[in-house]
């Protein structure tokens, strides 16, 4: 019976797997810290420049939005573009930290006016002399008289109103907003799931 040469049986020639040294506690903590910091930075960038989920707080946009619903708000289009009339937007008011959700009614250079019909008990908004078609308003509303004299917006001034006109603190009371106060465009409601829908 043949035998293998002794050198072929030498286990010292067999490659040995290198064992990875365990990380020190300091390196482990640093790794976790960097991971968390990166996640926070990414989240801040996304919320500041891309999109943000925001909860409706209040009834100023009924029937378009309901109290407690979660909205998906996009931001890039207002960073590189301009808002349009009828957009549902997220905005900030002077000297207030919280967000507000309103509808954009008039743009810089527009003249906005509100006339009250005593027979029908409704207010009609006019922009540049034309009545604004507002199908999103409640058809059974019984408005208070919120008539307003013609107001011509200056450069970088935007006029916003809530869809629930008798229960909305908006440009009729706080004045026109500046472009820097418009945060994003409400695109859809995603919660509750049963009422998820796009916002035109």
Give, region by region, the residue ranges found by the protein language model.
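Soluble "head" domains of membrane/secretory-pathway proteins
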Residues: 2-29, 45, 49, 54-55, ...
């Amino acid at each position: 019976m043949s035998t293998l040469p002794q050198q072929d049986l030498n286990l010292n020639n067999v490659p040995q797997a290198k064992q990875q040294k365990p990380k020190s506690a300091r390196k482990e903590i640093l790794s976790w810290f960097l991971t968390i910091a990166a996640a926070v930075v990414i989240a801040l960038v996304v919320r500041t420049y891309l999109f943000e989920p925001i909860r409706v707080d209040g009834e100023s946009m009924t029937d378009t939005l309901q109290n407690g619903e979660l909205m998906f708000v996009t931001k890039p289009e207002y960073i590189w573009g301009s808002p349009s009339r009828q957009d549902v937007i997220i905005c900030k008011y002077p000297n207030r930290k919280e967000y507000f959700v309103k509808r954009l009614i008039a743009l810089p250079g527009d003249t906005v006016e509100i006339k009250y019909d005593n027979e029908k008990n409704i207010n009609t908004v006019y922009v540049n002399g034309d009545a604004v078609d507002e199908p999103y308003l409640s058809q059974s509303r019984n408005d208070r008289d919120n008539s307003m004299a013609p107001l011509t917006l200056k450069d970088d001034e935007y006029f916003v109103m809530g869809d629930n006109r008798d229960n909305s603190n908006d440009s009729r009371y706080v004045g026109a907003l500046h472009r820097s106060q418009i945060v994003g465009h409400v695109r859809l409601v995603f919660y509750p799931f049963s009422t998820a829908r796009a916002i035109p």
